[in-house]
Amino acid sequence: MAKDVQVMLRQAVPGLGKPGEVVSVRPGYARNYLFPRQMAVRLTPGLLKEQQMRREQEAARKLAEKQQAENYKKALETIGRFVIRKKVGEKDLLFGQVTASDIAEVVLATSGLDIDRRNVLLDEEIKKTGVYLVQVKLHPEVTATLRIQVTPE
């Protein structure tokens, strides 16, 4: 019986794996199906080293991104309050409401940090003046809590 060969997948193969994974397959399957369709390459020591190096670089990049997000979190939380001025009617009710875009704009104006409005997590609608706590997702593992003060214009 033929011995299985080790290949690295270049693209997703149903039932086999994702790109970059090392899998064992029968030689005929590799030679007749995977190699001609450029779906996989034969695993060599050089390719293995290259893949290991890529993984290390990716891990270092992710760690640097998380560290940067932690630094942004500290900077945002030391600012204290972000003030948003809105037109107010009776009983301190706003005309409209404070949106995630408003919060992203005031953070940019105050701290210089450009955050995406989709990363601003509003637990409740802000329709009155006052102080509110708002979560901002800076990284999948890092969330900052901002104090937003809504005041009349």
Swiss-Prot record:
InterPro entries per the UniProt record, alphabetical: Ribosomal_bL9, Ribosomal_bL9/RNase_H1_N, Ribosomal_bL9_bac/chp, Ribosomal_bL9_C, Ribosomal_bL9_C_sf, Ribosomal_bL9_N, Ribosomal_bL9_N_sf
Annotated GO CC locations: ribonucleoprotein complex; ribosome
One GO process term, biological-process aspect: translation
Pfam families cross-referenced by the UniProt entry: Ribosomal_L9_C (PF03948), Ribosomal_L9_N (PF01281)
One GO MF term: structural constituent of ribosome
Domain of life: Bacteria
Keywords: Ribonucleoprotein, Ribosomal protein, RNA-binding, rRNA-binding
N-terminal signal peptide: none
PROSITE patterns: RIBOSOMAL_L9 (PS00651)
Keyword Coiled coil: no
NCBIfam families reported for this sequence: L9
Family according to the record: Belongs to the bacterial ribosomal protein bL9 family.
Role noted for this protein: Binds to the 23S rRNA.
Protein name: Large ribosomal subunit protein bL9
Organism expressing this protein natively: Synechococcus sp. (strain JA-3-3Ab)
Lineage: Bacteria, Bacillati, Cyanobacteriota, Cyanophyceae, Synechococcales
